[in-house]
């Protein structure tokens, strides 16, 4: 044990953690592009139909939709948006100019080399881990506990996604600038480094301009003032004024620009949808605690939300018993716990995923290390046998989860996008390509997911010079009955469900108010809703302006893991399609 402690307090440990983190995420260099990367490439390179029809610019890369209702209806009419979004208020506008700048550099210097783009992301991740290691030592001293926290943070498998996905680089930048802010604040308050009064708020601004996740560092600043400062209450609260000013002006600019989220199943805007956000915060708080401190990962919420919620609540109760003794005695532990808890507030606005845990993990690993330090310092021979067995079991579990399983899993999570890309590419290759299909409308009866298997495929093909008109009439895993009513019309009926399955987080496009008899008009089709179940259409008729077998149309359906050609039955006949399922 003494040897292990000496290693954790080694002067070169911060460098070791950086090398370890980079080494474990090195496979991500070959991830290539995936998901939003396709769209960002089209925007940054410009001179293509996709970028010309979007409000985003190279300097404002995350502006997808400014909330203009007429623009939304235009996109629905032109079938760029799915028909079930009719009547919805939609907005998707993130203000992240610093992150946009980092991507602009990629496409300015090495536009055809994704490997170098990923190398830039890994450099940011290396800087993040190094700063975290330095922060632990500044707060906890050059101790084995600080080293343990740094080690656990460096190999946290939750970091694989932001380290390996180019479009998620904004989280790395936000956390890097957030940590510099906290380090500068610490030096200002502890060493009377007055320059820190300028550097720290400036870094907070850079963190916020990198990504909304930067809000989380304000929780650590507040916790610092409450638990770590030893000045008067007035002096501690006064030290926070520069950050309040930065937050105020950032929020003002955010509001004036019209940034925010509306009408997206994946996000909940805390300002525009306050009550739904608070309900989701209550649901997701225990999920984040469970996924960050223990097991399974947060992403399992997508598969088993109820199980994760109830297990998370039970685990939160267990955490009170585990950490209460150290929280009572150690103000540093209280600092980490409070910062961790407050950092959950911004990420609860997003569908739970491990890629959002960079800030939360900072406090979580610090708290675990404080618990180890506190527990190791107790006179064990004076405790009961049950207590000793319980503590040993907990120590072993924490070491297995964060010291063994996490580093073993991190390489896989950092390059998991290659698996996603392969599945999207397989589906994309099932669609014919070539100049003869330039004006062809590719329509699929069903798709497992509209974002991944419609929009992302269209964007992928666009990056390859194939500007594909692709849409799906339904989305989800419900089996369908397809009835041909006439040479121009079909009726789709869901078997025991609805035509759109958007309850899961990966279905990002929310539905508007849908009712029986509703008519939605698109450029070449009129959709008439016949039946509704739970507010979503379960049966609808699609009246196309041209015959279904017109040469302008190519029809497909989802068959196992890819698209397959679809042939309509005779007029008056019905065929059955299995649900469009997909397995990541």
Which role fits each region the language model picked out?
Residues 1-451, 456-460, 525:
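Polytopic membrane enzymes that build or remodel cell-surface glycoconjugates and lipids
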Residues 3-4, 428-584:
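C-terminal luminal/periplasmic domains and tails of membrane-associated envelope-modifying transferases
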């Amino acid at each position: 044990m003494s040897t292990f402690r000496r290693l954790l307090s080694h002067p070169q440990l911060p460098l070791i953690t950086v090398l370890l983190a980079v080494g474990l995420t090195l496979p991500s260099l070959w991830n290539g592009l995936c998901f939003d990367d396709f769209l960002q490439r089209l925007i940054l390179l410009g001179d293509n139909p996709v970028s010309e029809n979007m409000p985003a610019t190279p300097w404002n890369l995350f502006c997808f939709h400014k909330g203009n209702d007429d623009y939304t209806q235009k996109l629905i009419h032109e079938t760029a948006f799915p028909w079930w979004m009719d009547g919805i208020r939609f907005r998707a506008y993130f203000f992240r100019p610093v992150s946009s700048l980092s991507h602009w550099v990629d496409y300015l210097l090495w536009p055809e080399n994704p490997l170098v783009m990923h190398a830039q992301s890994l450099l940011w991740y290396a800087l993040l881990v190094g700063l975290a290691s330095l922060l632990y030592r500044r707060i906890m001293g050059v101790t084995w506990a600080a080293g343990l926290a740094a080690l656990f943070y460096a190999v946290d498998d939750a970091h694989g996604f932001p380290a390996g996905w180019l479009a998620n680089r904004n989280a790395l930048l936000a956390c890097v600038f957030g940590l510099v802010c906290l380090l500068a604040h610490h030096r200002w308050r502890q060493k009377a480094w007055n320059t820190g009064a300028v550097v720290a708020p400036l870094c907070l601004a850079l963190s916020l301009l990198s990504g909304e996740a930067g809000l989380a560092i304000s929780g650590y600043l507040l916790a610092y003032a409450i638990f770590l400062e030893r000045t008067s209450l007035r002096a501690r609260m006064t030290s926070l004024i520069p950050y309040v000013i930065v937050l105020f002006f950032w929020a003002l600019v955010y509001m004036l620009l019209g940034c925010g989220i509306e009408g997206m199943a994946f996000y909940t805007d805390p300002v525009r949808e306050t009550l739904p956000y608070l309900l989701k915060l209550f649901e997701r708080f225990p999920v984040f605690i469970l996924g960050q401190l223990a097991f399974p990962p947060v992403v399992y919420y997508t598969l088993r939300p109820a199980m994760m919620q109830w297990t998370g609540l039970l685990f939160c109760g267990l955490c009170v018993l585990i950490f209460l003794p150290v929280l009572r005695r150690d103000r540093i532990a209280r600092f980490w716990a409070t910062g961790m808890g407050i950092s959950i507030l911004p990420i609860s606005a997003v569908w739970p995923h491990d890629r959002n845990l960079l800030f939360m993990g900072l406090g979580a690993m610090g708290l675990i290390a404080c618990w180890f330090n506190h527990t190791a310092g107790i006179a064990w021979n004076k405790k009961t046998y049950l207590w000793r067995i319980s503590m040993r079991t907990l120590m072993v579990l924490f070491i297995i989860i964060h010291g063994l399983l996490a580093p073993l899993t991190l390489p896989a999570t950092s390059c998991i996008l290659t698996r996603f890309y392969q599945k999207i590419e397989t589906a994309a290759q099932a669609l014919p390509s070539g100049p003869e299909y330039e004006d062809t409308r590719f329509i699929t009866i069903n798709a497992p997911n509209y974002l991944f298997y419609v929009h992302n495929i269209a964007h992928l093909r666009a990056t390859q010079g194939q500007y594909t008109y692709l849409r799906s009439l339904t989305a989800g895993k419900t089996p369908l009955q397809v009835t041909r009513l006439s040479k121009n019309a079909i009726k789709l009926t869901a078997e025991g469900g609805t035509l759109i399955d958007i309850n899961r987080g990966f279905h990002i496009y929310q539905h508007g108010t849908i009712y029986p008899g509703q008519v939605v008009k698109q450029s070449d089709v009129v959709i008439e809703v016949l039946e509704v179940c739970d507010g979503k259409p379960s049966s609808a008729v699609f009246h196309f302006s041209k015959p279904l077998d017109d040469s302008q149309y190519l029809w497909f359906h989802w068959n196992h893991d890819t698209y397959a050609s679809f042939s309509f039955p005779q007029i008056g006949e019905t065929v059955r399609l299995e649900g469009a399922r997909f397995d990541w």
